[in-house]
């Protein structure tokens, strides 16, 4: 992976500051400096994931309420026992780390976060701990909400405000690239506000898919979130330029309220990205400045070699402080679309949390065995005929159309066969999103009175329980999902919403916990 950091056991910087909780087994919060060391205490065993002595995070922090939950773990509020300072603790269950690649991914996430330590707009990793059951990452707590929250809270919006936000984002990416790191999952949800103060800094978070890179190194695995994935990622040949594309998509959304590449399915979104046709004719684009459109075009150039760099973005006249970005308010429709786009993402997040709990560890393991049994000629790839026969033998009830859909979605390189990674990615995606029982389980979570419909009150109650929405967003969701305009969401409307442009492109690789 071109790592430019030391091994995971050496990644953590030394510190004697108790408030950092730096995971060093030589210091316990609250211990007296004059305390005599324990006699004949056996050394702690070395953890297989982090490669250093295991330590109980609860000896330093009090773990509090759950903040978020994902397929691979839970994020909780935690409090440092000695100082009372609050942090976020991301806990990854070791039983979920079933492959060597999984373990390496966690190690790399820790290495990268320590490598970026001290950068003012990157969430700081305070400590990494490992016990017998889990790995715990204690991080700076960002309590101010997501990127769009600041825009929506102000109630008015200008190109100059968008330029200011984008400048911070690109400065973060420029720093990452200068330090040899590609983020690979840039999206509005991964930029959080440190607090609810108006001048609170914006922080980049979620480095679970990030990698170290060397100049000229080429990556091939498809990772990220569908709307924001660069075309060269889908072609399995990319470098740091892919981050610029993702930020270009964010800029497009900031200016008009919707993504530039849209379709009814993830596969359709990918096709739209590969076509690369960006709409600058629909409202509000005729009223957006020429300078803003010029920057978007340069960031969304389908050829990564011709795409503008982070340094060049920062020197573009539109993004510069007191530059060309006009200070006149953007169309109210842009604000409404932003609210709706954010609200829909939040609704899906809540539903995905329910669905994530439906896919068992046994199902994941079973998918690996399924691939082996389908690959009848042991070629390492399977054809559509092998897929059809294999699914039938497994007793999986899929229609011919669903088999074809699976094949098309999985065959990322378009060569007519799917390899192991493509198969696991696509089948896990189907298990999480398209299986009827999983969707229905999620629907029932919202349908509190079992009436067969989700009312405004039920939706508000469920999302408030998850801490995801305030009341202003409920109307936006209802109006978007409620196809028959009866003021409620029935199962067919819910299922259509869940299947529309699912944002997760590679669930197999993901270890992030959605907050």
Swiss-Prot record:
Q: What is its main location?
A: membrane
Q: Where does Ca(2+) 3 bind?
A: 447, 449, 451, 453, 458
Q: Which residues bind ATP?
A: 67-75, 90
Lipid-acceptor residues (N-myristoyl glycine) = 2
* Catalytic activity as recorded in UniProt: L-seryl-[protein] + ATP = O-phospho-L-seryl-[protein] + ADP + H(+); L-threonyl-[protein] + ATP = O-phospho-L-threonyl-[protein] + ADP + H(+)
Keywords linked to the UniProt accession: ATP-binding, Calcium, Kinase, Lipoprotein, Membrane, Metal-binding, Myristate, Nucleotide-binding, Repeat, Serine/threonine-protein kinase, Transferase
Instruction: Indicate which residues the UniProt annotation says bind Ca(2+) 2.
Output: 411, 413, 415, 417, 422
Membrane topology qualifier: Lipid-anchor
EC annotation from Swiss-Prot or TrEMBL: 2.7.11.1
Top-level enzyme category: transferase
Mind listing the GO biological process terms from this record?
intracellular signal transduction
Question: What is one GO cellular-component annotation here?
Answer: cytoplasm
Q: Name one GO molecular function term.
A: calmodulin binding
Q: Where is the active site?
A: 185 (proton acceptor)
The source's domain of life comes to Eukaryota
Query: Which residues does the UniProt record annotate as the domain EF-hand?
Result: 362-397, 398-433, 434-469, 473-504
Keyword set includes Plastid: no
**Residue stretches making up the Protein kinase domain:** 61-319
Functionally, this protein is described as follows: May play a role in signal transduction pathways that involve calcium as a second messenger.
Q: Which family does it belong to?
A: Belongs to the protein kinase superfamily. Ser/Thr protein kinase family. CDPK subfamily.
Domain-level remarks: There are 3 contiguous domains conserved in the CDPK subfamily: a kinase domain, an autoinhibitory (junction) domain and a calmodulin-like domain. The autoinhibitory domain (325-355) inactivates kinase activity under calcium-free conditions.
Q: What is this protein called?
A: Calcium-dependent protein kinase 2
Tell me the organism. Oryza sativa subsp. japonica
